[in-house]
Curated annotation (Swiss-Prot):
Its EC number is 6.3.1.5. It is an enzyme of class 6 (ligase). The gene is nadE. Transmembrane segments: none annotated. Belongs to the NAD synthetase family. This is NH(3)-dependent NAD(+) synthetase. Mg(2+) binds at D57, E173. It catalyses: deamido-NAD(+) + NH4(+) + ATP = AMP + diphosphate + NAD(+) + H(+).
Length: 284
């Protein structure tokens, strides 16, 4: 791909993902708190629900949600934020999860261990005759089951509380397709949309997060065989490079091509289910 064509694609993707050329943490916090509050009031909902993992994304989204419901209550509209701990058995980074909860200061915290449900589904699949190529493939499948069990738990609580599920997706994860479809990608409201990873961190700092939380190495931590595997190991590039791609900063052509490959391969994750009427190139 020529350099001008690559630059044009970068601009188009940044626009599609709503990455602004400018950023002010205080202004962005105000916009996003107001958005969540307006959504709840307009929809007649009374709760926000979000799983708090101990990472910076869920911590930041959770704090924004808590501030949104506090704003609503101050105006006379009753709403609450429910933080959920959703470990798979014992959590390796338990101390980080506790630090995150201290920052978020949720109205309520519920803990649901997804291990029994996830393991039961894996066993049921085996009993039904599903075989795997190897242990690594089985572990990959189990990882996605974990993410989807967490989604089930959050929607169960949201249904019981007349609430909405908050998602943690932002532009840097979205462009790479780094989320489980109908797992952590399953949500109603995305208060971090349009932000690069460095901007999520800047927003968290402005909201009062401490540096160990802000700078924690991002990990989905879904793989039992490779616990706490950093996201960047899966990408083969860094979040700094992904952010540079989205913010239009100078970068190596090969790195930009890597981002474009991930973007193209994961297009289906960012779309509603396809029909023959909207799949590119298919005669309807």
């Amino acid at each position: 791909m020529s350099r001008p064509d690559q630059a044009a694609r970068r601009r188009a993707i940044a626009a599609e993902l709503h990455v602004s050329p400018t950023f002010d943490a205080r202004d962005e916090a105000e916009r996003r708190i107001g958005f969540v509050a307006d959504y709840l009031r307009t929809a007649g909902l009374r709760a926000c629900v979000l799983g708090i993992s101990g990472g910076i994304d869920s911590s930041t989204a959770g704090r924004l949600a808590q501030l949104a419901v506090e704003r609503l209550r101050a105006s006379g509209y009753d709403a609450r934020f429910v933080a959920m701990r959703l470990p798979y058995g014992a959590q390796h980074d338990e101390a980080d999860a506790r630090r995150a909860l201290a920052f978020v200061r949720a109205d309520e915290t519920l803990t649901v261990d997804v291990k029994p449900a996830a393991d039961a589904m894996l066993a049921a699949l085996a009993a039904g005759g599903l075989a795997y190529l190897d242990h690594a493939q089985q572990d990959f499948v189990l990882g996605n089951i974990k993410a989807r069990e967490r989604m089930i738990a959050q929607y169960a609580v949201a249904g019981a509380r007349n609430g909405v599920v908050i998602g943690t997706d932002h532009a840097a994860e979205s462009v790479m397709g780094f989320f489980t479809k109908f797992g952590d990608g399953g949500a109603d409201v995305l208060p971090l949309a349009g932000l690069t990873k460095r901007r999520v961190r800047a927003l968290a700092r402005m909201l009062g997060a401490d540096e160990p939380l802000v700078l924690k190495t991002p990990t989905a931590d879904l793989e039992t065989l490779r616990p706490q595997r950093p996201d960047e190991h899966a990408y083969g590039i860094t979040y700094e490079q992904i952010d540079d791609f989205l913010e239009g900063k100078p970068m190596d052509d090969a790195v930009a091509e890597t981002v474009l490959r991930f973007y193209d391969a994961t297009r289906h994750k960012r779309a509603l289910p396809y029909t023959m009427f909207d799949w590119p190139g298919h005669p309807a």
